[in-house]
Amino acid sequence: MIEVSHVSAGYDGQDVLKDLSFSLPQGENLAILGPNGCGKTTLLRVMAGLLPCRGDVRVDGRSIARMKPRELAAHIGLMSQNMQIPFDYTVEDVVRMGRYRMRRRGLFEAENREDGQAVRDALETVGLWELRNRTANTLSGGQQQRVFLARVFAQQPEIVMLDEPT
C-alpha cells in the first residue's frame, strides 16, 4: 500500500503539490491525468523519493524518508519521461543496470541465476530479448522506451510508476 499524507512539494519555492493526500491499496492501479505543469511528474518524483517534500509518503507503513536508496529501489521502480540511453551499452546491459541498483556490487561483477533470469524475463516481457546484444542507443525511440520499461521490470519492485509511458 502507498499512503501519501499532506504532501506539498515544488520547485524554486513554488508549490506544485499542495497538501495532497490519498492511499492506494496493494493490487490497485492508478492513472494520474492532467495538463502540462499540473504536478504529475512532481508527484511521481516525490513518491519515488527523488524530490523532497513536506508531508509523508509511506510504502507498506514505512516512511520512504527513512529508507535507504537500495531499499527504496526494491519497493519502487520509476520509468521517467526524461531517461537517456547510456552511450555504447547493449540493451541487456541497460536492463541489467536496473537490477544492480538494488545490489551492492557493480554492474559487471558475477551475477547469480536469479539476476540473469530477471533480466531475461523483463526483456521477453517487452519483446526485446532478440535485440539484447544490440547497442541500445541505436534503437528507435519506442524501442528505447521499452528498454527502460524492461529495466524497471528487472528490478522486480513492488510498485511500478510510469511517467509519460506512451
Regions found by a protein language model. Name each.
Residues 33-35:
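The feature captures the beta-strand-to-loop junction immediately N-terminal to the Walker
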Residues 48:
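Helix-to-loop junction immediately C-terminal to a conserved catalytic motif
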Residues 55-63, 72:
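Conserved ABC transporter NBD signature motif
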Residues 96, 111-131:
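Conserved ABC ATPase "signature" region
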Residues 135-139, 143:
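Conserved ABC ATPase signature
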Residues 156:
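Conserved catalytic motifs of ABC-family nucleotide-binding domains
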Residues 160-164:
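Catalytic Walker B motif of ABC-type/P-loop ATPase nucleotide-binding domains
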